[in-house]
């Protein structure tokens, strides 16, 4: 079976065929580092980490680029609010992002460009758009993109161009030609970062950043562009308008977008106070539990977060690990179950179905090659299912375990069972095997 991916551009699943055989170039919009990462970041990061790893598992060489937005209105406003230097703010938050992503099993991108490092490329791209007649200047404001000049504007979000260029939008800037015209270069304001440009001192708009960085690092066209569904419009729509107008080339072949995270059936947002940071969750849950929670839902569907749903994921994950810890090691691979796993993943990264295959494998009493197959699946899932956890056993529990061992040697089974119940009440299970007694945290 060939990998099929849902392409937002065509609104259908398509067979994935890279531009260059066995080689994939992929760009995913990274975080704006105005704050620490939240559960929405975790979902996007895990989604595209899974895609990247599965592509590698399928035999592709992958060049994975994910940017860091380190200059933007949110960052400037946050720095003003805290009275902190912008560079210090972004470096501190970037460190938090990278640390937290690592704890949920996400690998660093092959290239992780910062927007501030590519301003010359952004200026060059705006100049090319200007030469082709796609831009205009609003005095004391900035350089804008005229969306009416790009005939395919709206094709990614499946909106009619004529609806997007009308000026009926309330509060639209009076000087804008069309309601969806967007800024390419913002003229500098007091106490804000700036760079020299042909239009005067200023800084790049958000949309031009990704267009310039992806073109410079990957070249056009490239295979996959990813991000959250909230980026489809206007961010990714505007990227297409910029890049295709400037280069006269197709920008991207496959557009892949992950669904949003709701908290107790309400969209997660700071203003509602239902905002969950990765760091807060890691106080109570292992990073791999968060990863398990994310892959338990299909990446395109919205996922509802609550304490109970994460507790359910924790219980399922720990049960799975406990079952696997009792399996005998073997190098054999069960081709039947591995094919089922591949078939699920090839169907637009159907991770919940692939997870069900894993559960079916470990529960199948007659299946051979379980550990060998799990090792293959782990190349994509990276749930640390085979990692032995070192558990700290309290002294009181150790004494009970030792007493039970003595009762077993004396064949005092009744007292041994009583001690087992006391150990379990303390939160630990004991399993008597041919290799000795194994103790696990319940």
Regions found by a protein language model. Give the residues of each.
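Short, well-structured beta-strand/strand-turn elements
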Residues: 61-63, 133-139, 365, 429-431
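N-terminal, positively charged nucleic-acid-binding surface of large information/translation enzymes
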Residues: 10-13, 19-105, 430-439
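Structural preference for alpha-helix termini/caps and helix-kink/transition segments
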Residues: 267-442
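Alpha-helical recognition segments enriched in aromatics with Gly/Pro capping
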Residues: 1-32, 49, 99, 104, ...
């Amino acid at each position: 079976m060939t990998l099929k991916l849902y392409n937002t551009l065509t609104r259908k699943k398509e067979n994935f065929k890279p531009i260059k055989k066995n080689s994939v170039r992929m760009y995913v919009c990274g975080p704006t580092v105005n704050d620490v990462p939240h559960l929405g970041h975790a979902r996007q990061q895990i989604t595209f980490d899974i895609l990247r790893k599965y592509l590698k598992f399928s035999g592709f060489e992958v060049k994975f680029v994910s940017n860091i937005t380190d200059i933007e209105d949110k960052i400037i406003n946050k720095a003003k609010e805290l009275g902190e230097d912008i560079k210090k703010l972004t470096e501190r938050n970037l460190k938090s992002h990278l640390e937290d992503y690592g704890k949920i099993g996400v690998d660093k991108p092959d290239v992780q460009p910062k927007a501030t490092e590519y301003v010359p490329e952004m200026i060059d791209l705006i100049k090319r758009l200007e030469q082709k007649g796609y831009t205009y200047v609003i005095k004391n404001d900035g350089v804008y993109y005229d969306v009416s000049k790009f005939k395919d504007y709206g094709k990614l979000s499946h909106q009619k161009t004529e609806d997007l260029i009308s000026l009926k939008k309330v509060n639209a800037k009076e000087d804008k030609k069309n309601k969806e015209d967007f800024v390419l270069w913002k003229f500098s304001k007091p106490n804000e970062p700036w760079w020299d440009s042909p239009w005067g001192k200023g800084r790049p708009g958000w949309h031009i950043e990704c267009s310039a960085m992806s073109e410079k690092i990957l070249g056009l066209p490239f295979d996959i562009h990813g991000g959250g569904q909230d980026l489809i419009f206007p961010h990714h729509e505007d990227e297409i308008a910029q890049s295709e107008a400037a280069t006269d080339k197709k920008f991207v072949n496959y557009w892949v977008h992950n669904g949003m995270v709701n908290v107790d059936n309400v969209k997660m947002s700071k203003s509602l106070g239902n905002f969950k940071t990765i760091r807060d969750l890691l106080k109570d849950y292992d990073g791999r539990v968060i990863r398990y929670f994310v892959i338990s839902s299909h990446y395109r569907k919205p996922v509802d977060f609550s304490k109970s749903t994460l507790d359910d994921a924790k219980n399922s994950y720990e049960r799975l690990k406990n079952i696997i810890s009792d399996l005998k090691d073997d190098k054999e691979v069960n081709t039947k179950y591995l094919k089922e796993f591949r078939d699920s993943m090839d169907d637009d990264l159907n991770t919940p179905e692939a997870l069900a295959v894993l559960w079916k494998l470990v529960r199948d009493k007659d299946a051979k090659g379980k550990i060998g197959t799990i090792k293959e699946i782990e190349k994509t899932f990276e749930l640390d299912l085979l990692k032995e956890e070192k558990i700290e056993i309290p002294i009181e529990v150790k004494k009970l375990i030792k007493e039970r061992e003595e009762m077993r040697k004396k064949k005092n089974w009744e007292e041994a069972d009583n001690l087992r119940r006391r150990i379990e009440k303390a939160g630990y299970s004991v399993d008597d095997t041919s290799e000795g007694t194994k103790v696990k945290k319940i």
